[in-house]
């Protein structure tokens, strides 16, 4: 096997892609900071049980596992940063009020999530802990859309769902609850024949409600239909009210309601939202409420957040990240060295051309030159 080959769905990030990723990372983290979010940097490697406190079987399957040579315990390479941030909030910060945290780092997946997806994503996200009200969900939803607009994306479609609807239906019917995982699979895949089979012997109200969910998809008017077709339960009424408020917030964004979109159901406890753009089949960003995520660390707090993959965002973003620079000669000249240092201190990129290498530089567009005129070094257009 060639020594330069990489594993399947693993790739190097070359300069043109890397500078775009870094430009987007800086833009998004700066925007998070403008909202009051503090950055944290969890480790790439943790004890497996710490990484798998939430997310169900899917997260376990996506997590690389290895043995710690020091302790003999099983370690995991993180597949999702959110549980780590929950651990930091619950165990290390231990604050009483609202905490806003953000992050950006690599995650590893044992299997790609799509045909051409990478197994090494760069996950960036933001989370609010400590507020159970819808105000936190509204802020996170707005921040997610703000981040996508910063990346130059337009014609965004926001899909909204709510884990509380299915949870309420299963809580009132023990027989349905026993088939919860199968019902979740059928609803997520919009597999109506399987859904009909699974609900055939359930109570009439539960059967009718579960069979209605795949058809409750469309614009915000679907919520009115849902109120007539679903049982009048406090949890369902509250979920539909939340979705109505979330749907009314975005401006200039297409909003769709999908009460059968349950991806992440095992993880979420309330509103769920996904952002799509034209020409991209999968969601570019996902978020939602997950109030139970800190429970395994001894301190469950209300929590809501969103995340996205920076590599995928860079692939579809029209943002131009190629910077301008000043091309300077290389010479052992004190005046030249002082001029170069002064320009760099002022924030300019100055590239000194090494002797015998006059090729065009790809990383930066050298639109100016540092030249000597009348004994002084000055910058001129190229």
Swiss-Prot record:
Pathway: Amino-acid biosynthesis; L-histidine biosynthesis; L-histidine from 5-phospho-alpha-D-ribose 1-diphosphate: step 1/9. GO terms for molecular function: histidine-tRNA ligase activity. It is found in: Cytoplasm. GO terms for biological process: histidyl-tRNA aminoacylation; L-histidine biosynthetic process. GO terms for cellular component: cytoplasm. Required for the first step of histidine biosynthesis. May allow the feedback regulation of ATP phosphoribosyltransferase activity by histidine. Heteromultimer composed of HisG and HisZ subunits. Belongs to the class-II aminoacyl-tRNA synthetase family. HisZ subfamily. This is ATP phosphoribosyltransferase regulatory subunit. It comes from Burkholderia cenocepacia (strain ATCC BAA-245 / DSM 16553 / LMG 16656 / NCTC 13227 / J2315 / CF5610) (Burkholderia cepacia (strain J2315)).
């Amino acid at each position: 096997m060639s020594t330069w080959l990489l594993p399947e769905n693993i790739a190097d990030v070359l300069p043109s892609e890397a500078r775009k990723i870094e430009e987007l990372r800086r833009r998004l983290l700066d925007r998070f900071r403008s909202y009051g979010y503090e950055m944290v940097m969890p480790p790439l490697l943790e004890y497996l049980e710490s990484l798998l406190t939430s997310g169900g079987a899917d997260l376990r399957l996506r997590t690389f596992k290895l043995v710690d040579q020091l302790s003999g315990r099983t370690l995991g390479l993180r597949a999702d940063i959110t549980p780590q941030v929950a651990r930091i909030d619950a165990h290390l910060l231990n604050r009483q009020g609202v905490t806003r945290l953000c992050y950006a780092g690599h995650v590893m997946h044992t299997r790609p999530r799509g045909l051409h997806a990478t197994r090494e994503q760069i996950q960036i996200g933001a989370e609010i802990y400590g507020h159970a009200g819808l105000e936190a969900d509204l802020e996170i939803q707005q921040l997610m859309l703000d981040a996508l607009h910063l990346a130059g994306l337009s014609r965004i479609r926001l899909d909204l769902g709510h884990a509380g609807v299915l949870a309420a239906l299963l809580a009132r019917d023990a027989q349905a609850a026993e088939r919860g995982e199968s019902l979740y699979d059928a609803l997520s895949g919009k597999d109506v024949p399987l859904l009909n089979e699974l609900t055939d012997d359930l109570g009439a109200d539960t059967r009718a409600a579960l069979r209605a969910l795949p058809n409750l998809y469309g614009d915000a008017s679907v919520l009115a239909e849902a109120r007539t077709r679903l049982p009048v339960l406090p949890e369902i009424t509250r979920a539909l009210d939340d979705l109505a408020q979330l749907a009314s917030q975005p401006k200039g964004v297409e909003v769709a309601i999908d009460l059968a979109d349950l991806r992440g159901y095992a993880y979420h406890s309330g509103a769920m939202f996904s952002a799509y753009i034209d020409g991209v089949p999968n969601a570019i960003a996902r978020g939602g409420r997950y109030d139970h995520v800190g429970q395994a660390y001894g301190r469950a707090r209300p929590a809501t957040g969103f995340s996205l993959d920076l590599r995928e965002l860079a692939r579809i973003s029209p943002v131009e990240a190629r910077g301008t620079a000043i091309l300077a000669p290389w010479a052992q000249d004190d005046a030249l060295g002082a001029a170069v240092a002064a320009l760099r201190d002022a924030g300019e990129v100055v590239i000194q051309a090494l002797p015998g290498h006059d090729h065009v530089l790809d990383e930066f567009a050298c639109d100016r030159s540092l030249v000597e005129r009348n004994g002084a070094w000055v910058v001129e257009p190229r």
